[in-house]
Each structure stands twice: as structure tokens, then as C-alpha cells.
Amino acid sequence: MVQLNQNFINTIAQELPAHLSMDDFIAACSRPLRRSIRVNTLKISSEDFKQLMQPKGWTFDPIPWCEDGFWISYDEEEQLGNALEHIQGLFYIQEASSMLPPTALFTPNADWQCVLDLASAPGSKTTQMAALMNNQGLLVANEYSASRVKVLHANVLRMGASHCALTHFDGRVFGEYLYESFDAVLIDAPCGGEGIVRKDADALKSWSLDEVLEISETQKALIESAFLALKPGGSLVYSTCTLNRHENQGVCEYLQQTYGDAVQFESLNQLFDGAEKATTPEGFLHVWPQIYDSEGFFVAKLTKTRSVPRLQPEPKLQKNFPFTEASAKQAKAIQAYFADDLGIELPDDLIMVRDDEFWLFPHEFRDFIGKMRFQRIGVKLADHSKHGFKVRHEAIIALAGKALTAATNGAKVVDVSDEQAKEYLMGRDIPLDTAGKAQGEVIVCYGGAPLGMAKHLGNKLKNSLPRDLVKDKVLLLPPQA
């Protein structure tokens, strides 16, 4: 049973728009959320995904503000996170409202090449933006919590987002270290979480205005840092999953009061059909749960019209960056290995070397070398030894998708059944029905997307899945009559 703190109710009652009723708000907060997912178009089109899942009893109701987002219904009560297609990275379990901020940032004419996600974990919006960028340009994804950085990296890897650079800092440092470096910035700020009560019945049990005001001070510092990191002419989207004015309009107004006409609010009134139902006088989206039968959410978009002075002197460049650009000989060798042994043509990105490791970085990352420490950049391609190259799992997940549709071009692909895919993801070797000639390293594929690597020994596939990715449980969604 949802518990709404009376102080919260009293406060929200004063802020609820006149055309909405408090009874409807409380009723909406008491209803379970509709299940929603976003198709990962880095691996599969929405149409192909629907064709894949409809025989398994899924029905799809389009989310109006996300082309690849759907409310779904199906009969199974199992946890979707264990589904084979989820482990494979074909979809992300994401609440519908949380798909709004990337949609607001990536309007149809946006061509952002360098983007910052200031508070990224667990990665729903990061991977949504990676798909909108089609793994082009550079997406810097920051997360302050050390434990959540690991979750972020796992989701980036699972979804095949290859052009990300992960950082682990307090978001308040970006305006200093990466001043006016980004075409676009998303800040989905840490907040009081008033909008998620449908998912967490106790979210508002101990609500207090003092805590709200304290959080809003942190949010003001974060949005100012994000604004300083934004290039002139760039766009910033600020969002929260909370409902009070202090953490939403108040934070945006603070930024405009601080930087004057350098801050230009952009109306989101026409972002999607029906957006006007949630649009505030300033042009922000204030999504109350009863409007779209979703979580509560707030989204604001602004343009930085001119440069503003930096608050701190420019930091000195950091030394001892551990990567060097591959020589022409090294680059040719790794490209030949991927093409000849795996049937994968490496994209025209920056091939970097660290000791015996080969990595693929976005070209745009060059401008960031020495400015900040990064936890993880791009994709690790392979390790090199006297025996040759050994491909990395993450490279296959991020880069093999296009090769799998054209095995005749030389891609070494073994298609497996759903039962075999389950066995593979649980770390087991796969017996082959008929013995044949050993083929060495092959890409294991299910349903047109890669699962990972195996060694073809003629009579079986020897599993090469990294131990930390082995699953205890894999759910096969059964066909429905």
C-alpha cells in the first residue's frame, strides 16, 4: 500500500495545476506502473523486435514520446531481467517517463557529436542516447557512486554502446575541468524521488521540506557545472523524477538568474502529440502521474546563447595518459585480424594501444586527453601475445551486429537455438549435432544478434563467455498459442 506523507500532500496540493485533481493524483500514485521497455536499435529494429516477441504473447502500445519505447503486456510473471532477449541487449527495461529527457535533447535536427550525461547510472538514458547517436561521436557518461559505475558499465557493455567514455566524479567538477567542451548535456539530477512512488511505495514515507531544500542546493550546483561544461549554442536538458517546484522550476530559475540572457529556455510544448497536457508556462514538462499514467517527472530544456566566464582557472593538463595511438603497422594488423578471422570490418575510429591491449576510441576523444581521468573509454578490441590476437567479448557485442546479417562476407558465425543460447549464457559448452572440421574462434549468435565467442572444436563449441557474465538463470519466453 502506497504511503503518502501528509506534509507532502499539503505541499503538493498547493502546486498541483488547477485543471488536475488531488484525488486523481493520489489514485494514480496507488496504481501499479505499466510495464515499459525500450528497444535497443543498436542491435535490432523496433519492427523486428516486435515480430520476434509477438509470437511469445507480447503486445505493444507505443509510448508517444519515444519512437522505440513501448508499454508491454504479456502473461509471464517471471522477472524480465532474466529473459534471454534482455541479457542479449535487445531491449532495456525503462520506465516510460525516463525516456523523455533524451528525446528532448535529441530533437530531429540535433546533430550532437560530443555529449555529456552528468549523472548516468544505471544507464537507461545513457544507452538511449547512444542509440540516438547510432554509436557516433563521443558520449561521456559520469557517475559519482563507485558501485553504480560498475552497473553503468555492465549496461553499456550489454547494449553494445561503443562510443562511451565513463567517468567517476562529483558532477560539480565538470564545469571546471571540461569548460565549454560539450555540444549537449543531460543532467538527470539526483532528487527526492517523489515521482517514483508507484514503483517504491515507501518513497515518500519520511518526506520533509528541509530535505527537499537541501537537495535543491546540490541540484543548483550541478546544473551550473553542467552549464559551464556546455559549449555556446549547445543544449542542456535538466530532469528529475520528483514533483516539487524547489527541485524543478526553482533550479532552472536559479540558473537563469545567475547567467541572465545566456540562458534561453526552450518550449517542449510540441515535443510529442499531447505534450501540451504537461507543459508549464515556462515551456517545461511537469509530468504528473495521472496525465499519461506514468511515473511523475520533470524535464526542462535550455540553450546556452553565449560564452560565460569560467569560475576557476584552467586546470593543468594531466600527464601519463596510458594509451598511445597505434602505429600504421599495428593498426593494419588488428584490422586484418578482425576482417580475416572474424569477418568484421572495424569502424574508422581511433585505434589505441596500452601495453599488449588494443582499444577503439571515438576520434572526438582526442580533445579530452589529459583533461580528466577516465574509468573506461570506448571498446577493448583484443589482447596481443606471441600467439597472436585474442578478441575481447565486449568488442564482439559492440561491433559484430552488422557482420551477423552477412555471414557470406566472411563472418564466422554459428547460429544456435534458444535452448543452446540458454546453455551458452549459463557458461556451458554446446555439443554440436554433427561433427565437422574445427573452425577455431567463432561468433555465437541467436536471433540475429551476438551472444559472445566460442572455440569451434568440431564436435562442440567451447564456451568463451567471461566468467563474470555467466548467468545462474536464463528465462526462455515460451511461444503463446
Swiss-Prot record:
S-adenosyl-L-methionine binds at residues 119-125, 143, 170, 188. NCBIfam families: nop2p, PRK11933.1. The lineage of its organism: Bacteria, Pseudomonadati, Pseudomonadota, Gammaproteobacteria, Alteromonadales. This is Ribosomal RNA small subunit methyltransferase F. Its EC number is 2.1.1.178. GO terms for biological process: rRNA base methylation. The gene is rsmF. The keyword Cytoplasm applies. One of its GO terms (cellular component) is cytoplasm. It comes from Shewanella sp. (strain MR-4). Belongs to the class I-like SAM-binding methyltransferase superfamily. RsmB/NOP family.
